Amino acid sequence: MLKFPRYIHTSKGEKMTSDLGLIGLAVMGKNLAMNIRDHGFKVAVYEYVEGVADDFSATQAEVEHIEDPQNLHIVSTHSLKELVDNLHTPRVVFMMVRAGDVVDFYIDQLIPLLSEGDIIVDGGNSLFTDTNRRVARLNEKGLNFIGMGVSGGEHGAHYGASMMPGGNFAAWKTVKPIFQAISAKVDGEPCCHWVGDNGAGHYVKMVHNGIEYGDMQLICEAYQLLSEGLGLSHDELYDVFKKWNQGELSSYLIEITTDIFAYKDDDGQPLVEKILDTAGQKGTGKWTGINALELGMPLTLIGEAVFARCLSAQKDERMHAAARLPKTKVAFTGDKAAMIDAIGDALYAAKLISYAQGFRLMREASKEYHFALNYGDIALMWRGGCIIRSQFLNNIKQAYNKNPDLENLLLDDFFVNAMQKAEAGWRKAVILGIELSIPTPTFSSALAYYDGYRSEKLPANLLQAQRDYFGAHTYERIDKPRGEFFHTDWTGEGGDVSATTYTA
């Protein structure tokens, strides 16, 4: 039996008002509405498609055997004005709508209906720069705006998601009891903490999604090495992934991959083998890669994961290339059990690289955009409810507890030891892919980053000499102080170069 004693706001002679208004009744919106209600809050809902809100409330009342829909504590409304009028002050309007122009459309409609101090929350996958703009715009009108990343899919929306709010901090004290109540919990801690000002919440969600792209591609590369390279059956794949999910690789994505390998189609054959090998994407991984380029951060693994999806989408072209550029058939003849372990090492090490690159990107963004991110709290928020929840997120939290100014997770003791332990197997797995002509773009790029990051000397001295040769871009010398720049007349036909002129 549900109870609603604490959060329903009423006064004598007044009708009962709602704690929160929710716009958007697609899959995520519906499940969030039920989650909010299940935690003792009354929620008013609105959907622009006529009849959807009424049908949702009526269906839920029927499913839950509630005779009077008023007792459902989910109130269907038929206009934005009715939605707003149903809310107590300060009003909280939570939008779960498609990112982009739709968000601005609803903001435009809500502004004249709201009063100073009211709050609009965008729970979609909005680009953080759009959230920056919306925070500033609404602040000028005396309204508060929160951009909140929500991860966890349909199940998380209903039973507890990872929630990453940022924007106008003045609004946090009002929405905190609701959002922390409905978020996932790990060890009694809510997977929802204030992230930072302006678009910080949506920025962190963007990086989360980039890491998600990386994790998924890494698993796919392990799958191809195991199935195509080692010839494992689906029953054997199931056993391998089930074992991995009981150890250091334990994570949501490994868990669901195990389930996928176990699932059979109507004819008893593995369903996954009947799915066309073309991957879709909604753009958040691409946003992460673009932002990394803008900040000058080597987000190599996530970039390769995005490109792998792009390549998969070129199915017809790949079919033509497969006929024109046939691979040499090579069979694996080594110790299969040892190679399975090596692939597991590669998956783990590359996964650590993905998180290290993601957190390094957030560190740079925090400085550039003045987000003041708390990386330990971010790791805590990702432990439950979300798609990238993994066992070692606790280790990330501990790393930042020890050193809040940690430059890169790879420098923490846990990561140092983990990488040293996995390195030999990681290299064997990449070599296997090379020998068998099986592409491993994320395994390989992660290894290249790892080797590059720990290289005291890289060949960029030659690169800078080339730049100076053809473009007079100057260079620094190792026998001179940093910050002093030189140009060489490499051909004897050049001219003078300064910081502001080029006459060579």
Features from the language model and the residues they span:
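NAD(P)+-binding Rossmann beta1-loop-alpha1 motif at the extreme N-terminus of oxidoreductases
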Residues: 9-91, 113, 117, 153-158
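Generic secondary-structure signature for well-ordered alpha-helical cores
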Residues: 34, 38-41, 61, 85, ...
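Hydrophobic beta-strand scaffold residues
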Residues: 43, 76, 145-146, 299, ...
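Glycine/threonine-rich flexible loop motifs
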Residues: 92-109
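Rossmann-fold dinucleotide-binding core
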Residues: 103-106, 121, 127-238, 246-270, ...
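Interdomain hinge/lid region at the active-site interface
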Residues: 202, 227, 232, 239, ...
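Small-residue-rich helix-loop
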Residues: 244, 366-399
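C-terminal amphipathic alpha-helical interaction region
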Residues: 428-429, 434-504
